[in-house]
Swiss-Prot record:
Keywords: Ribonucleoprotein, Ribosomal protein, RNA-binding, rRNA-binding
UniProt xrefs under CDD domains: KH-II_30S_S3
Coiled coil ranges: none
A single GO cellular-component term on record: cytosolic small ribosomal subunit
Protein name, entry field: Small ribosomal subunit protein uS3
SUPFAM superfamilies: Prokaryotic type KH domain (KH-domain type II) (SSF54814), Ribosomal protein S3 C-terminal domain (SSF54821)
Residue ranges of every copy of the KH type-2 domain listed in the record: 39-107
Subunit structure: Part of the 30S ribosomal subunit. Forms a tight complex with proteins S10 and S14.
Top-level taxon: Bacteria
């Protein structure tokens, strides 16, 4: 069933950890979970142009720490930090606690599955030929060091009367191998012919040690991203 399941969920606790990192009792859990959903929704809405790939939420004692992984940190921060202050106030209104927002710059957006999927979806909305968009993304990822990539596009591609699925793959994408570091992203293109779905799998190598934080450590060491600014 490795072909069917979300490869991120399959590897949680093995070489990847959760994007919500906190513990709560039975009475508080539902409330905090809904807060996380609202925080992510409002940040994605406000930061549409900032190429946000991932939002990590941590809750130390009476605080809320939000880490935004973005390919355009300048858009998130805004002029003299004005935009990030607005975001902090909006998140604080939801959580009613002290909020800290950190920004991590993604140095190689071509190797982030979510950003690749969103880029292809945006090109489909601009009526770029879907084969050209897919091939360009595959070539860019392999050139920058990916060991394998697969891209699926489905829907009324090119305005066809009958919906279908097209896919490209280059290199290895071992979905059954649990130690494989596989990034997965999805996006939806809203075209005049209807919606088109985009799925991207990127294989970046194998993580041999059993460490749920291994992928985050790789990113922190500069493999794919680097810290940009801590906003208190």
């Amino acid at each position: 069933m490795g072909q069917k399941i979300n490869p991120i969920g399959l590897r949680l606790g093995i070489n990847r950890t959760w994007d919500s990192r906190w513990f709560a009792g039975k009475n508080e859990y539902g409330k905090l979970l809904h807060e996380d959903v609202k925080i992510r929704a409002i940040l994605h809405k406000e930061l549409k142009q900032a190429a946000v790939a991932r939002i990590v939420i941590e809750r130390p004692h009476k605080k809320c720490r939000v880490t935004i992984h973005s390919a355009r940190p300048g858009v998130v921060i805004g002029k003299k930090g004005a935009d990030i202050d607005k975001l902090r106030k909006k998140v604080a209104d939801i959580t009613a606690s002290d909020v800290v927002i950190n920004i991590v710059e993604i140095r190689k957006p071509e190797l982030d599955a979510t950003l690749v999927a969103e880029s292809i979806a945006q090109q489909l909305e601009r009526r770029v030929a879907f084969r050209r968009a897919m091939k360009r993304a595959v070539q860019s990822a392999m050139r920058l060091g990916a060991e394998g990539i697969r891209i699926n596009c489905s829907g009324r591609l090119g305005g066809a009367e009958i919906a279908r699925m097209e896919w490209y793959r280059e290199g290895r994408v071992p979905l059954h191998t649990l130690r494989a570091d596989i990034d997965y992203g999805v996006a939806t293109a809203f075209t005049t012919f209807g919606t088109c779905g985009v799925k991207v799998w990127i294989f970046k190598g194998e993580i041999l040690e059993h460490d749920p934080m291994a992928q985050d450590k790789r990113m922190a060491e500069g493999d794919n991203s680097r810290p940009r600014r801590d906003a208190a």
